[in-house]
């Protein structure tokens, strides 16, 4: 959840800034070709910046420390576990970090498999059994082995491109008119307003698609963990999470918007725990 939230937040912020620049300056012009080229460039810029900043941002956001020399048995176990599992998965050893938090959480991030990170909270190490923690770490290693951050970046880049392109094509059509001399003119104020509103609306639809893909990745990472440590350990870890907290709970802002019930699942980066457990049992 942490890596997805950071990725999408950064991507969205960059998209908004670049979108305003495009609208105010009119860089893309009115031609379909010009709008398409700028949509691709700016669409992928947001996701690529998010990708290459992901590791640094994740570390700073939770105050995590990369373990260079284990200071206790817990850190030693964590480093050895990540090393063993990364060898099993056939990927370079990721950086291993730990951060102080009561939350039972872990995440993996990084631009490439050779420049990746696995971070675990002290709350997870203190709450879960060794087998359960091992399964969670394997889940994060599987994310790296599957190249999930890169695939999410490519998907987000494509979605961004469509959001920018469609919003500006529609805005161009809505804001264009002909004067008394038959010359085509465009209202810059209308263009800016329409393009920004459409970008937000299309952005919501793009988020739903991105979250669907994120949930699919979680099922794959669960299966990857099962291959590394056995599905019973992963099931036990998910059952522990069920007892500890409700990972399906959404931020209050979404509840305030009356996004609840079945609709909530469209905006969740992770599938409901019961569905993940059922999928593991069916392996």
Curated annotation (Swiss-Prot):
Subcellular location: Cell inner membrane
A GO term for molecular function: metalloendopeptidase activity
Assigned EC number: 3.4.24.-
Assigned GO CC terms: plasma membrane
Cofactors that this protein relies on: Zn(2+)
Enzyme class: hydrolase
Key words, A-Z: Cell inner membrane, Cell membrane, Hydrolase, Membrane, Metal-binding, Metalloprotease, Protease, Stress response, Transmembrane, Transmembrane helix, Zinc
CDD domains, per database record: M48B_HtpX_like
Topology in membrane: Multi-pass membrane protein
Gene3D superfamilies: Metalloproteases ('zincins'), catalytic domain (3.30.2010.10)
One Pfam family matching this protein: Peptidase_M48
Residues given in the record as Zn(2+) binding sites: 139, 143, 218
Active site per database record: 140
Transmembrane residue ranges: 4-24, 33-53, 147-167, 192-212
Cofactor: binding details: Binds 1 zinc ion per subunit.
PANTHER family: PROTEASE HTPX
Family: Belongs to the peptidase M48B family.
Protein name (Swiss-Prot/TrEMBL): Protease HtpX
Organism: Glaesserella parasuis serovar 5 (strain SH0165)
């Amino acid at each position: 959840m942490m890596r997805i939230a950071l990725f999408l937040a950064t991507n969205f912020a960059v998209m908004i800034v670049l979108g305003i620049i495009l609208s105010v300056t009119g860089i893309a012009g009115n031609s379909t070709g010009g709008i398409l080229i700028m949509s691709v460039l700016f669409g992928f810029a947001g996701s690529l910046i998010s990708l290459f900043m992901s590791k640094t941002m994740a570390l700073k956001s939770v105050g995590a420390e990369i373990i260079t020399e284990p200071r206790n048995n817990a850190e030693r176990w964590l480093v050895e576990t990540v090393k063993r599992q990364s060898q099993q998965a056939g990927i370079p050893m990721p950086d291993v970090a730990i951060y102080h938090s009561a939350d039972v959480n872990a995440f993996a991030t990084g631009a490439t498999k050779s420049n990746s990170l696995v971070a675990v909270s002290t709350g997870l190490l203190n709450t879960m059994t060794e087998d359960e923690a091992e399964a969670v770490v394997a889940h994060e290693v599987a994310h790296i082995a599957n190249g999930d951050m890169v695939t999410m970046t490519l998907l987000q880049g494509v979605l961004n491109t469509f959001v920018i392109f469609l919003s500006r094509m529609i805005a161009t059509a809505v804001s264009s008119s002909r004067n008394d001399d038959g010359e085509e003119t465009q209202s810059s104020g209308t263009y800016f307003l329409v393009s920004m509103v459409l970008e937000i609306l299309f952005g919501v639809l793009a988020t739903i698609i991105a979250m669907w893909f994120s949930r699919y990745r979680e099922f794959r990472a669960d299966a990857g963990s099962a291959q590394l440590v056995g599905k019973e350990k992963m099931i036990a870890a998910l059952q522990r999470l069920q007892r500890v907290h409700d990972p399906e709970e959404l931020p209050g802002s979404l509840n305030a918007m009356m996004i609840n019930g079945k609709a909530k699942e469209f905006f969740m980066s992770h599938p409901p725990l019961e569905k993940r457990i059922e999928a593991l049992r069916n392996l």
